[in-house]
A protein has these predicted regions:
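Conserved NTP-binding catalytic cores of kinases and kinase-like/nucleotidyltransferase enzymes
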Residues: 1-36, 145, 152, 165-170
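Short pocket-lining segment of the protein kinase catalytic domain that shapes the ATP-binding cleft
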Residues: 39-46
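Residues forming well-ordered secondary-structure scaffolds
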Residues: 6, 20, 36-39, 58-61, ...
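"Short basic amphipathic alpha-helical interaction patches in structured regions
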Residues: 1, 41, 54-57
Length: 176
Protein backbone atom coordinates (compact mmCIF):
# COMPACT_ATOMS: atom_id res chain seq x y z
CA UNK A 1 0.00 0.00 0.00
CA UNK A 2 2.85 2.42 0.64
CA UNK A 3 3.79 2.35 -3.05
CA UNK A 4 0.32 3.72 -3.78
CA UNK A 5 0.84 6.43 -1.20
CA UNK A 6 4.11 7.34 -2.91
CA UNK A 7 2.34 7.64 -6.26
CA UNK A 8 -0.39 9.85 -4.80
CA UNK A 9 2.21 12.07 -3.16
CA UNK A 10 4.25 12.31 -6.37
CA UNK A 11 1.27 13.62 -8.34
CA UNK A 12 -0.03 15.77 -5.49
CA UNK A 13 3.22 17.22 -4.14
CA UNK A 14 5.98 16.91 -6.74
CA UNK A 15 4.56 16.73 -10.27
CA UNK A 16 3.96 20.47 -10.61
CA UNK A 17 7.60 21.39 -10.00
CA UNK A 18 8.98 19.14 -12.74
CA UNK A 19 9.21 19.99 -16.43
CA UNK A 20 8.91 16.41 -17.65
CA UNK A 21 6.42 14.43 -19.71
CA UNK A 22 4.13 12.76 -17.23
CA UNK A 23 0.36 13.11 -16.88
CA UNK A 24 -1.21 16.07 -15.14
CA UNK A 25 -3.18 14.96 -12.09
CA UNK A 26 -6.33 16.80 -11.12
CA UNK A 27 -6.97 15.05 -7.81
CA UNK A 28 -5.43 12.26 -5.75
CA UNK A 29 -6.15 10.60 -2.44
CA UNK A 30 -4.78 7.75 -0.34
CA UNK A 31 -6.57 6.08 2.57
CA UNK A 32 -3.96 4.65 4.94
CA UNK A 33 -6.49 2.51 6.82
CA UNK A 34 -7.59 0.55 3.74
CA UNK A 35 -4.60 1.04 1.43
CA UNK A 36 -6.97 2.27 -1.26
CA UNK A 37 -6.09 5.17 -3.49
CA UNK A 38 -7.33 7.11 -6.46
CA UNK A 39 -5.79 9.51 -8.94
CA UNK A 40 -7.79 11.52 -11.46
CA UNK A 41 -5.47 12.49 -14.29
CA UNK A 42 -5.61 13.78 -17.81
CA UNK A 43 -6.80 11.49 -20.58
CA UNK A 44 -3.60 10.97 -22.55
CA UNK A 45 -5.60 9.83 -25.57
CA UNK A 46 -6.63 13.48 -26.00
CA UNK A 47 -2.98 14.11 -26.94
CA UNK A 48 -2.91 11.03 -29.20
CA UNK A 49 -0.66 9.15 -26.79
CA UNK A 50 0.11 5.52 -27.53
CA UNK A 51 1.01 2.89 -24.98
CA UNK A 52 3.82 0.60 -26.13
CA UNK A 53 3.92 -3.12 -25.60
CA UNK A 54 6.28 -3.96 -22.73
CA UNK A 55 8.31 -6.21 -25.04
CA UNK A 56 8.20 -3.86 -28.01
CA UNK A 57 10.73 -1.42 -29.39
CA UNK A 58 11.12 2.34 -29.10
CA UNK A 59 12.70 4.78 -31.52
CA UNK A 60 15.94 6.55 -30.71
CA UNK A 61 14.00 9.82 -30.31
CA UNK A 62 11.61 8.22 -27.82
CA UNK A 63 14.45 6.72 -25.79
CA UNK A 64 16.29 10.05 -25.83
CA UNK A 65 13.10 11.75 -24.62
CA UNK A 66 12.71 9.33 -21.70
CA UNK A 67 16.36 9.61 -20.70
CA UNK A 68 16.04 13.39 -20.77
CA UNK A 69 13.05 13.27 -18.43
CA UNK A 70 14.88 10.96 -16.04
CA UNK A 71 17.95 13.23 -16.11
CA UNK A 72 15.75 16.25 -15.37
CA UNK A 73 14.11 14.40 -12.47
CA UNK A 74 17.43 13.28 -11.00
CA UNK A 75 19.10 16.68 -11.42
CA UNK A 76 16.18 18.54 -9.84
CA UNK A 77 16.42 16.57 -6.60
CA UNK A 78 20.16 15.75 -6.58
CA UNK A 79 21.43 15.95 -2.96
CA UNK A 80 18.48 18.16 -2.07
CA UNK A 81 18.31 19.34 1.54
CA UNK A 82 14.57 18.69 1.19
CA UNK A 83 15.23 14.97 1.86
CA UNK A 84 15.59 16.01 5.52
CA UNK A 85 12.51 18.21 5.34
CA UNK A 86 9.36 18.00 3.24
CA UNK A 87 10.69 14.97 1.32
CA UNK A 88 11.61 12.92 4.41
CA UNK A 89 8.71 10.58 3.53
CA UNK A 90 10.62 9.27 0.50
CA UNK A 91 12.27 5.87 0.80
CA UNK A 92 15.99 5.26 0.70
CA UNK A 93 17.78 1.94 0.13
CA UNK A 94 17.87 1.37 3.90
CA UNK A 95 14.61 2.95 5.06
CA UNK A 96 10.99 3.13 4.10
CA UNK A 97 8.26 0.81 2.97
CA UNK A 98 10.10 -1.55 0.63
CA UNK A 99 13.07 -1.82 2.99
CA UNK A 100 10.72 -2.56 5.86
CA UNK A 101 8.94 -5.22 3.79
CA UNK A 102 12.23 -6.89 2.86
CA UNK A 103 13.54 -6.80 6.44
CA UNK A 104 10.23 -8.20 7.68
CA UNK A 105 8.56 -10.92 5.62
CA UNK A 106 10.64 -10.34 2.48
CA UNK A 107 13.02 -13.29 2.69
CA UNK A 108 10.20 -15.71 3.46
CA UNK A 109 8.12 -14.35 0.56
CA UNK A 110 11.09 -14.89 -1.76
CA UNK A 111 11.52 -18.44 -0.42
CA UNK A 112 7.85 -19.14 -1.15
CA UNK A 113 8.23 -17.78 -4.67
CA UNK A 114 11.21 -20.05 -5.25
CA UNK A 115 9.22 -23.05 -4.02
CA UNK A 116 6.39 -22.24 -6.45
CA UNK A 117 8.48 -21.51 -9.53
CA UNK A 118 10.93 -23.81 -11.24
CA UNK A 119 12.02 -20.90 -13.42
CA UNK A 120 12.95 -18.78 -10.39
CA UNK A 121 14.88 -21.69 -8.88
CA UNK A 122 16.74 -22.10 -12.18
CA UNK A 123 17.92 -18.49 -11.90
CA UNK A 124 19.65 -19.26 -8.62
CA UNK A 125 21.31 -22.28 -10.21
CA UNK A 126 22.51 -20.18 -13.16
CA UNK A 127 23.90 -17.57 -10.79
CA UNK A 128 25.74 -20.23 -8.84
CA UNK A 129 24.66 -18.67 -5.55
CA UNK A 130 22.35 -19.68 -2.75
CA UNK A 131 19.46 -17.49 -1.69
CA UNK A 132 21.29 -16.74 1.55
CA UNK A 133 24.39 -15.56 -0.36
CA UNK A 134 22.29 -13.32 -2.60
CA UNK A 135 20.43 -11.97 0.43
CA UNK A 136 23.73 -10.98 2.04
CA UNK A 137 24.90 -9.37 -1.21
CA UNK A 138 21.61 -7.48 -1.52
CA UNK A 139 22.10 -5.82 1.86
CA UNK A 140 25.72 -5.05 1.10
CA UNK A 141 24.60 -3.36 -2.13
CA UNK A 142 21.80 -1.49 -0.32
CA UNK A 143 24.31 -0.12 2.21
CA UNK A 144 26.57 1.07 -0.63
CA UNK A 145 23.63 2.73 -2.39
CA UNK A 146 22.50 4.35 0.85
CA UNK A 147 25.93 5.96 1.31
CA UNK A 148 25.78 7.65 -2.11
CA UNK A 149 24.26 11.04 -2.99
CA UNK A 150 20.45 10.98 -2.87
CA UNK A 151 18.01 11.95 -5.55
CA UNK A 152 14.47 11.06 -6.52
CA UNK A 153 14.01 7.97 -8.70
CA UNK A 154 10.99 6.95 -10.74
CA UNK A 155 10.93 3.60 -8.96
CA UNK A 156 9.68 1.33 -11.75
CA UNK A 157 11.16 2.47 -15.05
CA UNK A 158 10.40 0.03 -17.86
CA UNK A 159 8.69 0.22 -21.22
CA UNK A 160 5.32 -0.85 -19.81
CA UNK A 161 5.27 2.29 -17.64
CA UNK A 162 5.74 4.69 -20.54
CA UNK A 163 3.61 6.32 -23.19
CA UNK A 164 4.51 7.82 -26.55
CA UNK A 165 3.35 11.19 -27.83
CA UNK A 166 3.39 12.47 -31.42
CA UNK A 167 6.69 13.92 -32.56
CA UNK A 168 8.94 11.33 -30.96
CA UNK A 169 8.36 12.19 -27.31
CA UNK A 170 7.77 9.75 -24.49
CA UNK A 171 6.44 10.07 -20.96
CA UNK A 172 6.51 8.19 -17.67
CA UNK A 173 3.64 6.58 -15.76
CA UNK A 174 3.30 4.58 -12.53
CA UNK A 175 5.37 6.60 -10.06
CA UNK A 176 6.34 4.40 -7.11
Amino acid sequence: ATMYQNEVRFYRDLRSELDIETPQAYASSFDAASGRFGIVMEDLRQRSARFPNATGAMSEAEITSLLGHLATLHAHFWESPRFSGDLAWLWSPCSGGFHDFLRGPGLEVIRQQLEKSEYKRSLLVRLGRSLEELWTLLWRAQAILDSQPRTLLHGDTHLGNTYLVPGGGAGLLDWQ
